[in-house]
Amino acid sequence: YEIAQCLVGSEMCIRDSGGGNYEHSDMLASMKPGDKAVLLMVHFGTTHDDTRALTIDAINAKTQAAFPELKFQEAYTSRIIIRRLKERGITKLTPLYAMLKLRSEGYTHLIVQSTNIIDGVEMESLRRDVESALPFFKEIRVGTPLLYSIEDAEKVASILGNRYNAPAQSKKATKEHFVLVGHGTYTPSTAIYSQMDYMLKAGGLTNFHVGTIEGYPTFDTMLAQLKAGKAKRVTLIPFMFVAGDHAKNDIAGEWKEMLEKEGFTVSAQLEGLGQIPEIQEIFIDHIRFGLKHRMLDIMTKKAAYAAGKDTE
């Protein structure tokens, strides 16, 4: 059984397909008569109907259109959201329950794609669910979150710059500053947010800053950058797939108020990353790559090195 964690659009993947970290492996082409394949889209979830329609429902529809040959199923990871939706008569399955349900329906091959932004605790939880379900399927592959490779981050930086920065600077004499506010995490994966901040500035978007609610960069770190850049106008943008509770309460509420107390003119663009068509396409590319490639197990690679392969 295989768990393939697939990196999309990366030169490393292209170079290593057929060897190295990834190898070409067409999951659908390997299926035998009677086998059935399914795509499981996994979301953290939201109780906000308005933003769900613009993000989760939108990407669900887009992936179904992109992969008509696959059965489609969705799952939510947030037990709190699942419980609250159930109280409203809306049923959402957890990833493990969804996988076991699909196996009972005769599905043998599964590709799992989450809409997580970073490879943090939510991805860790998802992979554990997949490990629990592995014995019941012939193959399961797990796609990577939005920001996994350097190329992923470069694409996202370019998309956000084109979406917010270029229109703003063409209309305003005073340069506007943009703050991307992520959820953050207590794990080392929080470094991805600092990477994004660095890459935005390295790409010429010096008026873009990244902050997190529960990780690093902190509010104070971001505030120091705004002051160093002599910003006057600030737009807060959720760096999250869905603009739900955090966006409406923490970003448009607490963060906006704290910045206004510092003397900035502040607005909040309550748009989740999942609303942006180009961001949706990155997730679809991850699925596409996952169907055609799988990651080689590290012990398999070390065995090859021990047998005489020269590069490690």
Range-by-range predicted roles:
Residues 6, 45-48:
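Catalytic nucleophile-elbow at a beta strand-turn-alpha helix junction centered on a G-D-S/GDSL motif
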Residues 114:
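Glycine-rich, histidine-containing beta strand-loop boundary motifs that form or position
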Residues 1-9, 13-14:
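Single conserved hydrophobic/aromatic residue that forms the stacking wall/gate
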Residues 15-40, 47, 53-111, 123-217, ...:
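Non-catalytic structural scaffold of enzyme domains
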